[in-house]
Amino acid sequence: MPNRQLKFKWLRLLFIIVLFIGICFRVINIDKKVYWHDEAYTSLRIAGYTMKEFAQGAYAHPDSSIKYLQTFQQFKPGSQLRDTIHSLAVEDSQHPPLYYVLLRFWVELFGNHVTTIRSLSILFSFLAFPCMYWLCWELFQSPLVAWVAIALLAVSPVHVLFAQEARQYALWTVTILAASASLLRAMRLNTKWNWIAYAVTLSASLYTFFLSGLLAIGHGIYVFVIEKYRLSKKAIAYLFSWSLGFLIFVPWILSLIQNYSMFQMTTGWTNNSLSLFIFSRRWLLNLGHIFFDLGLEKDPEFMAIYFILLVLIVYAFYFLIRHAPLKVWLFVVTLIGATTLPLLLPDLIKGGQRSIVPRYLFPCYLGVQLAVAYLVSQKISKPKLFWQTIWQAIAVLLILGGIISCTISSQANTWWIKEISYSNPQVAAVLNRANRPLIIATNGCINNGNLLSLSYLLEPKVRLRLVDIAPLAQVPQNSGDTFIYGDCTEPVRDSITKKKGYKLEPILPYLWQLKSRD
């Protein structure tokens, strides 16, 4: 027994070192990666602007420096908190306001620099560590499982990437963990204040991201299965807490219903179908990126590693269900199943890509980490030295994979997480080298957010002409280089190529240069 206690102390020290490394990864180069489309929208919302106001302003200043767009990344004169909430409610109700309200206060206190804006997400990501420990203690009642889970979370590439995003997903991670731990504690102690605490954490999660509604469904399934489908005191207490949590969220539900057409418009892209090969590949990468991620260019070279990680994950769930008590494995399974199947099944039946959007999968990521943490902690505690050594090596490889991945991504100026803005650093480099550059961009699709993103990277000499998604009556005259930029520019490009004396040369994704045919 003394040897085992000494061994755990050494393991805990190693896990603390890994935790420190994970904290360092979250704060290193937080302003280096491109401030992308979605983050630019975050700044627009907290500034109190709507996208309608952005378009009106850009139309009113044709051929002005693209730096003019930075106006919409600063607080609107006279703007108040209600302007931020209104902007979200009428144009982007898929994003509840809790994170944006907190971020607005944060920026008012500490300034509007990219580093400052992203630092709030980093602080939220730090809170995930004690919440993970709390959840593991309530679920497994094992300090070793908790420390393994914290180590995996600390150097998880996907968690580190989202910790540096000016988006709500680090906060969502915290609220998922806190609500889940609160539920387990309330079921264990069954006191009024613990059930109220669950209601509060659940409503906080709902006000952070709307998919927390699926989390609540998973919790409900878990409670009623554990209570053997009886309306017991705990089941009644859960229903009360669930009702209270959703009652607090009702104002935003009403806002979402009132602006449902805009909600459909902003999430409609998730209905676009992908081939089965691409869909399966994205699922494989999403699961693999929990532990290993060398970037888009390197992913094809390491598909074997992702398949090995998939086998490990499948085995972790087999081991969990085979060896853990029902109340343990059922919680992990419902955490993943209730939040993933409602996204996956429509994709498989009707087509779409809801279930492969990484930011929608944080409950799944956390469930996978819980299962793997349980597997590793059980295996490295085995009495047989040979298997103990093998699994210690596997644990080291998992952590090293995360450290290597985070080391590489920390030095990059873009990553797959930047999605539609992935090429913006390259686009900016081309435009900044050009002679008196003029960008012609259409108003709509993904362009406005990407233009705001580019405004952080471009020199003041770059000018912008915002036009409708329609054929150009005439080509704008420019003594320097003229570029077409953005999605949904086909009508503009077609009208140019049909005019005598002009041609378009593809440069990068979403970027074409206007050339003379002479």
Predicted region positions:
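Interfacial juxtamembrane loops and adjacent helix segments
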Residues: 47-95, 99, 107-109
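Specific aromatic-rich, kink-prone transmembrane helix
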Residues: 105, 131, 151-155, 171-189, ...
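Transmembrane-helix motifs of polytopic, lipid-linked glycan transferases
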Residues: 119-140, 178, 318-319
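Transmembrane-helix signature of polytopic, membrane-embedded enzymes
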Residues: 132-155
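Perimembrane helix-loop-helix junctions
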Residues: 182-198, 202, 214-246
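Transmembrane alpha-helix segments characteristic
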Residues: 202, 243-244, 307-312, 323-348, ...
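Hydrophobic/aromatic-rich transmembrane helices and adjacent perimembrane loops
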Residues: 330, 352-383
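Catalytic lumenal/periplasmic loop and adjoining terminal transmembrane helix
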Residues: 385-513
